[in-house]
Design a protein with these regions (language model features):
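A contiguous loop/helix-start segment that scaffolds small-molecule binding in enzyme catalytic cores
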Residues: 4-6, 75, 152-242
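Short gly/ser/thr-rich secondary-structure transition/capping motifs
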Residues: 10-16, 137-140, 202-204
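Short, well-ordered secondary-structure micro-motifs
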Residues: 44, 88-89, 116-118, 141-143, ...
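Class I S-adenosyl-L-methionine
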Residues: 1-104, 110, 115, 210
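Class I SAM-dependent methyltransferase SAM-binding "motif I" and its flanking Rossmann-like core
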Residues: 85-153
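A polyampholytic, Gly/Pro-enriched intrinsically disordered region
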Residues: 73-79, 123-133, 207-216
C-alpha cells in the first residue's frame, strides 16, 4: 500500500529533529511543505524532489502530497514543530478520505512550547495550556473564552501565533484578559526564532508583556502563580519538596 508520512520537523534546527524524522526523510522521494520550512531542509536533504505552496494553500498542499504518494513515490508532508499541534496531521487525515489507497503515518516532532520552554529554562514545568491567537481559522470570541478559562484555572499558558501585521494588538488584548485573573508581576517569557538563526529570549512580567511588541516568529509564555525567575531563567516548579 502506498504511504504518505506527515512529519513534524521540530522548531527549526536539524539537530532538534527526531532520529525517526530524519531517517524517514532520508528514504523519501518527494518532500512537500510550506516554502519557508522546505528551505530549512534543502541543505540536509539536497537530493530530494521538493514541492511547495505558499501560506493559506494548506488543502492544496495536502492533495499534492497524496497525488505523489498515489503515483508510488515515497512522500513526506513536513510541518514545523509537531505535525499534530497546529500542524497538518488532522487535515491530512480529513483529505485522506479522498485517497483510501494511500496510508498515512504521523511522525512527531518537538513543538514550540517545548523548545521555547527549554530556552527559557523550565517554563513549562506543570500543567500547561497551548492557545493560538490566530483568528484565521478560529473566531476571536472563542479564543478569548479559552484564554479566560486557562487563566482562571492558573495554567501556564503558551501562546502560539501571538502577532502579525493584521493582529498587532492581539497579544495586548490577551494580556488584558490574563490580568483579570493573574497578578501584574506574573513571570512571563518570550522566545523568538526557536532553534534558528537569531534566537533570542527574555523574561518579563505580565504587566511588561502587555506593552511589548512581538512578531510571528515569537512564542510567548505566561507563568502560573508559582512560576519564578532562577538564574535569569523562567522556572515553573513541579511541586517537589526540597
Amino acid at each position: 500500500m502506498n504511504k504518505v508520512y506527515v512529519i513534524g520537523m521540530g522548531p527549526g534546527a536539524y539537530e532538534q529533529m527526531t532520529v525517526k524524522a530524519v531517517r524517514t526523510l532520508e528514504k523519501c522521494d518527494v518532500i512537500v511543505g510550506y516554502t519557508v520550512y522546505i528551505e530549512l531542509l534543502k541543505e540536509y536533504f539536497p537530493d530530494k524532489r521538493y514541492l511547495t505552496t505558499s501560506m493559506r494553500q494548506e488543502a492544496a498542499r495536502c492533495r499534492m502530497a497524496f497525488e505523489e504518494a498515489a503515483k508510488g513515490a515515497v512522500t513526506a508532508m513536513v510541518c514545523s514543530g509537531d505535525a499534530g499541534i497546529y500542524g497538518m496531521a488532522g487535515l491530512m487525515y480529513e483529505i485522506g478520505e479522498e485517497y483510501p489507497e494511500v496510508a498515512i503515518e504521523v511522525i512527531p516532532g518537538m513543538t514550540a512550547a517545548l523548545g521555547g520552554s527549554a530556552v527559557l529554562g523550565a517554563a513549562v514545568g506543570h500543567d500547561v495550556s497551548l492557545i493560538s491567537l490566530s483568528d484565521l481559522l478560529t473566531p476571536w470570541e472563542l479564543i478569548e473564552e479559552r484564554l479566560r478559562c486557562a487563566a482562571k484555572a492558573d495554567f501556564v499558558i503558551c501562546l502560539y501565533n501571538p502577532s502579525s501585521r493584521k493582529r498587532s494588538t492581539y497579544l495586548a488584548k490577551a494580556c488584558e484578559i490574563m490580568l483579570e485573573y493573574k497578578a501584574e508581576d506574573t513571570v512571563c517569557g518570550i522566545v523568538k526564532n526557536i532553534a534558528r538563526e537569531g534566537e533570542t529570549m527574555q523574561t518579563l512580567t505580565l504587566k511588561e508583556l502587555k506593552e511589548t511588541t512581538v512578531d510571528m516568529f515569537s512564542t510567548v509564555f505566561i507563568g502560573n502563580k508559582q512560576t519564578k525567575v532562577i538564574r535569569e531563567k523562567m522556572v515553573t516548579p513541579r511541586g517537589y519538596r526540597i
